[in-house]
Amino acid sequence: MPIVMARDLEETASSSEDEEVISQEDHPCIMWTGGCRRIPVLVFHADAILTKDNNIRVIGERYHLSYKIVRTDSRLVRSILTAHGFHEVHPSSTDYNLMWTGSHLKPFLLRTLSEAQKVNHFPRSYELTRKDRLYKNIIRMQHTHGFKAFHILPQTFLLPAEYAEFCNSYSKDRGPWIVKPVASSRGRGVYLINNPNQISLEENILVSRYINNPLLIDDFKFDVRLYVLVTSYDPLVIYLYEEGLARFATVRYDQGAKNIRNQFMHLTNYSVNKKSGDYVSCDDPEVEDYGNKWSMSAMLRYLKQEGRDTTALMAHVEDLIIKTIISAELAIATACKTFVPHRSSCFELYGFDVLIDSTLKPWLLEVNLSPSLACDAPLDLKIKASMISDMFTVVGFVCQDPAQRASTRPIYPTFESSRRNPFQKPQRCRPLSASDAEMKNLVGSAREKGPGKLGGSVLGLSMEEIKVLRRVKEENDRRGGFIRIFPTSETWEIYGSYLEHKTSMNYMLATRLFQDRMTADGAPELKIESLNSKAKLHAALYERKLLSLEVRKRRRRSSRLRAMRPKYPVITQPAEMNVKTETESEEEEEVALDNEDEEQEASQEESAGFLRENQAKYTPSLTALVENTPKENSMKVREWNNKGGHCCKLETQELEPKFNLMQILQDNGNLSKMQARIAFSAYLQHVQIRLMKDSGGQTFSASWAAKEDEQMELVVRFLKRASNNLQHSLRMVLPSRRLALLERRRILAHQLGDFIIVYNKETEQMAEKKSKKKVEEEEEDGVNMENFQEFIRQASEAELEEVLTFYTQKNKSASVFLGTHSKISKNNNNYSDSGAKGDHPETIMEEVKIKPPKQQQTTEIHSDKLSRFTTSAEKEAKLVYSNSSSGPTATLQKIPNTHLSSVTTSDLSPGPCHHSSLSQIPSAIPSMPHQPTILLNTVSASASPCLHPGAQNIPSPTGLPRCRSGSHTIGPFSSFQSAAHIYSQKLSRPSSAKAGSCYLNKHHSGIAKTQKEGEDASLYSKRYNQSMVTAELQRLAEKQAARQYSPSSHINLLTQQVTNLNLATGIINRSSASAPPTLRPIISPSGPTWSTQSDPQAPENHSSSPGSRSLQTGGFAWEGEVENNVYSQATGVVPQHKYHPTAGSYQLQFALQQLEQQKLQSRQLLDQSRARHQAIFGSQTLPNSNLWTMNNGAGCRISSATASGQKPTTLPQKVVPPPSSCASLVPKPPPNHEQVLRRATSQKASKGSSAEGQLNGLQSSLNPAAFVPITSSTDPAHTKI
């Protein structure tokens, strides 16, 4: 694949490939380079990691651009490359465009690089990045060129070799010194000393004089991290990024010796100070001067406000960087010439750490080989993402498939006859030789630039020098936020004598890049003035604020939609990278590659006197322009005419849309229903795009995964509820939890796209119906449709969210978005809606009602915007929880069913627990005229911990709502769906019931109660369709017929005496394996009863006021009884006793008959036992934690466990029958009354496990608690059964 390619200028575009080339010429990610602008180079956009624009990815994907990362893990680099269509290959692969490594490269790897391949390190870069080598190189330059010329390091000694010199210096000045390992980073192994005896000489270390007069801001010490890019060492080309980081210590600076060991005071490394408890981080990318990490521009602006000379400061910083790199230039340039086959194969980003003292003199601390690209704060992401994107653009990745390379020879014109770039047009002539191609390139360039421009500038240059000259010019055209500090128009005169690598390339660049610069002979003051103006320009660039990625994204989209960006014959800059100054406009006017953007002044083509006279006119305006203009703005310099008065004409693109919809809505305007639906559809499309994007630069941590999981859960909830209101059936296939996170996001995005399609169709149908009626209400006029459509095309997700939130707040309802009902009843295994069409539409309107926040920022990254439209239920649920602790009189709100976090049947896993309350079946259901109110809730086999009333459910990696698995079909009920449905819902209250009441009607005496902490309180307003209830009852009837019930389920506590009869057939074994018989009341044909005895007080207890009953001792309804009641009410057949005795259990029948005959005696027994043990058990009730509450991890469904043959968890010993009672299976008559009295009298007072005591405690606890509605629990461990 040739890098320099000639083309026939007379060739016409006649083939389809020609048309493709033309269509790609204006692509925002392509910049054309080479002699005839035939070589496409990729342009990177920092905001691509947020947008995941397919238009940006298409170039990289088309040419199979690839990268590999070796011995490091840079998520930011990976995310930027992936967003631009690159794909990652194995570290051992040889087909790549970029190798990003964290260590030095071996010579044999460098030798095999092709011209299109690039690596991020130069050979022998350790000459700069190792502290000992850096020290030696600078000391050598001090000896050669003078100490003052290279006095950029504090006084330093290399130990143990120079220990004697160090002791001699210490004896003269007993100040503090700082010790550093020669090859470490991030502050590891760094400490301060004030005596040579404190130093360990076991390894090589560097000892430097501690700068005890650092520049302080608010009494805190700080240093500056600068990002320096070197693209070539022969010739030397250095760029400094216009933004950096100021890193502050976390403890106020104090020179006292007592604080010499306090690293948080003396060290400014982020890796050290982030461990301090005083470290402050800023979460707003727009705030750059807060916390322990500032932007460099914010620091410079602060110093300028304090009256400091920031222009001179940054000029000294540039001087320090240039001299540092020059000190290692010879060694690195020699290694490049030896090992690197192509000049453009290597580039390197250095991290310079500079400390500024109180006199504004910068001191070099160290140079980092691979500066940290971690983004621990939004400010890091804004600066580092912009810097990396601009660096990749400057380096220049040629759009070429790495697998198609045919040769690795260093002379790249010889690629001409081997491979062609797919972008390039087919040549009708024969392949050109290297010399022919180069000459034709030069001719073509001369034609494009005009006679006398570039044509004359290359006279006398070799082919290699021409290629180097063109590459350096093209790099500067793509520099973005980088500022080229070497070479400039003055650097050769200042630093030329310091260069040790004696080649002609540096001099060639100095003379050819700035060949038109004014000679300063006889006018040295003009030379100084030119230097000052250049320094002011650079200082203004360093001080201006960097735009956030979100603003860049909006600006680029706005400029692309308007298509107003002018085209230049040389530069095709992206929107973010067009930072135009007066000197840059001169370059665009002349369209010559040999003009320097930042260093060239307009007066260079005029006389010295003319510069002196007119420089005062444009220099202040230039500085003011850059200071008041943010980086990467959209201003365009249209004209720069020196002869016409040196005025700068600016054309500013309008960033704000002309049509301000929010202003119209606030001025009593309104949207029509169709416009509201269109805006909502556009919002959902933004959400879909956000789901389809990759993780970007986010850290794959537990918190990030939890947040992503929560966002997907919001989408799932929305789809389930919204699809239920569609007129058309829509199948929702939800992703499995076993899939990868990104794969689940992709599936959800696909499902959301399907929903949007159906939603848009229904919107069109609604529009057609309205157009046929020809009757429009006054409020349906809405805003101007053309302006509205333009707003929809340009609006961002944040703007749409703001409009929809305001519209919902203004109209008091969001039902227009999703409707209020559907034609048919649509249910799923997680939620239900009203079965009848039109039933309580206000219910759904309340569910989708949006509660906007009090304050809303449109510039934030909206990662959870969908929750504004789907989680209003959560907001109402929190209000319910906060009020639930107020007692039975707490008013319950209506909560949408989408807040249901999990739905469990007997074989499903539990979800987060919420407090629930009882509700009643409407009396209007024909098939159930007298059915008592029940709850068809189930409890999972392993109950999860419950939330305390009023507690807030905070998402966490292990405890947040999960994305449901399986398929969700809108259509008729299946048996499984209906079962899950009826077991996960509460029956709604009748319309005559008092709003917010949680009590049961006292006339409904046959009520069974239950608690379930996995259910939400969000289903109060829901009703069952009659057909749905009938289907479920039929299923329960079939289940009842085939189920074998445990006999122990319906034997009262009095049957404990039967255990002394030694019953046969294993009845007692099953009884002990199940729950205590006391907890399982018998359900008689006439209704549920609590005892087989005739208790005259029972009806009174059943109908007593609920307010007088304890919540801790409330009654419970077991699943078996609930199903039996449902069965009896549905079929009209009175079910038999749940225990059907077999042929071998006749002894039990006899025992029960005997018990019936002993009712009066038992009653007397109870009275006497109560009187005898009143002193022991009188003050005791049955605690929740001992009798009624099982362990959270234990199984709670006793009836199900018994029916399935599994052993449920046994209760405490004091309610379990004595082991001796089951020693024999021979039935015996019950003991007479006198024997029982004697036995009870002989029992010790400390024993509370006797049958009489148990019966007394149980009876006293059950009687006052019969049929108490359980609204909430005050015991965190209270497990609802």
Swiss-Prot record:
GO terms for molecular function: ATP binding; metal ion binding; protein-glutamic acid ligase activity, elongating; protein-glutamic acid ligase activity, initiating; tubulin binding; tubulin-glutamic acid ligase activity. Residues 1086-1113, 1199-1212, 1240-1263, 1270-1281 have a biased composition (Polar residues). InterPro entries: TTL/TTLL_fam (IPR004344). Keywords: ATP-binding, Cell projection, Cilium, Cone-rod dystrophy, Cytoplasm, Cytoskeleton, Disease variant, Ligase, Magnesium, Metal-binding, Microtubule, Nucleotide-binding, Nucleus, Transcription. Coiled coil: none annotated. Expressed in the retina, found in the rod and cone photoreceptors (at protein level). Widely expressed with highest levels in heart and skeletal muscle and low levels in other tissues. It comes from the Eukaryota. This is Tubulin polyglutamylase TTLL5.
